[in-house]
Amino acid sequence: MQKLVAIKGMNDILPPDSARWEWLEDKVRTLMARYAYRNIRTPIVEPTPLFVRGLGEVTDIVEKEMYSFEDRLNGEQLTLRPEATAGVVRAVVEHSMLYDGGKRLYYMGPMFRHERPQRGRYRQFHQIGAEALGFPGAEADAEIILLAHALWAELGLENVRLELNSLGQPDERRAHRAALIAYLEQHMDVLDEDARRRLHSNPLRILDTKNPAMQALVEGAPRLIDFLGEASLQHFETVKAILDANGVAWSLNPRLVRGMDYYNLTVFEFVTDQLGSQGTICGGGRYDYLIEQIGGKFAPAVGWALGVERVLELLKEQETQVARPAADAYAVVPDASALPVVMAALQRLRAQGVSVQMHSPTAAGEGMGSMKSQFKKADASGARYALVFGADELARGAVTVKPLRDSGEQAERPLAALAEWAATLQSSR
């Protein structure tokens, strides 16, 4: 029978790699709590119109990359989420979450895009994101950027730089759009097929082209920031001033437009040169009109999302050490007849918060194995202590506690006194 394997571009996350994921997620949860962000979890499958309306019909994601299908039960058009912001906004609108003021939310989870798998880019990938909804001020933009910047410090990430731009408001973009189209129409011979297709539908995205033959053209294109009015400029200046006051370095990138149509005013990316062409590890911006587009009352919002795989890849590139989780203790059990007593003792320890791994045979009828082989496995497990439940110890109602990592002498302890040892162990963590 043919062996079934994972879909190309959709990867299993196995130990010990999964420990790196847990470490990152724990760091994020701790940091989000400091900034008063609360967790939200939305469905992986959403109505297709949510993304068409929210992201824009002529975006690459909607045109080329979504996993969409028809529900066989009712004919509804459904899509595996390619990003999470639209789903978070849908949930906020559906459940009237802004009735009593703004909300700070964060999420973690898998996203799906049908694209060619390569380093840092997968068909199932994972994002962590933060959304501040109901806050119109530039301080909200700055705070959410500071949140991401603080995360890099928590993770020990280096060589990550911040790029900023402002997309202004819709009327300012319309004026820039007209000037941009007029400029590009004078250079039709330089435009590639994709740029010609976008010229009158989404010309701003042409500025984000990776085509080397078009780089000189886009460098000379009208800059959106030169079309901003006083209010938009002041908003952007306030964001930059707050970042400066916090010692956060940034650079202006007038070609930064992001891949979704819902952005306005501040947009930003955190980028690195250590991941080749997939150098953006986090991006976001303000999206004041998305809530209204999805059917809610107008409410401002700003957010970002980071690519988990890319962040972990960057940590690996920088050789950041992530502590491998290990049990506090490893139970060495020479005789299977002792298992009822041993497992009762281990359950009491676990109830007190002690993590214990018990040696178990890997094949039927194999037996418990020699003491020597069990001690080898105990040492390889990374546990701090071995708990030896030998026949002599059990006859005395005791267990031998042998340090494997910590200093100190091995000692015999009564089974009834293991609770005291557990309390001492926890206080020494």
Swiss-Prot record:
Catalytic activity: tRNA(His) + L-histidine + ATP = L-histidyl-tRNA(His) + AMP + diphosphate + H(+)
Gene Ontology biological process terms, A to Z: histidyl-tRNA aminoacylation
UniProt main location, coarse: cytoplasm
EC number(s) from the headed UniProt entry: 6.1.1.21
The keyword rRNA processing is annotated on this UniProt entry: no
Subunit details: Homodimer.
Name of the featured protein: Histidine--tRNA ligase
Protein's organism: Acidovorax ebreus (strain TPSY) (Diaphorobacter sp. (strain TPSY))
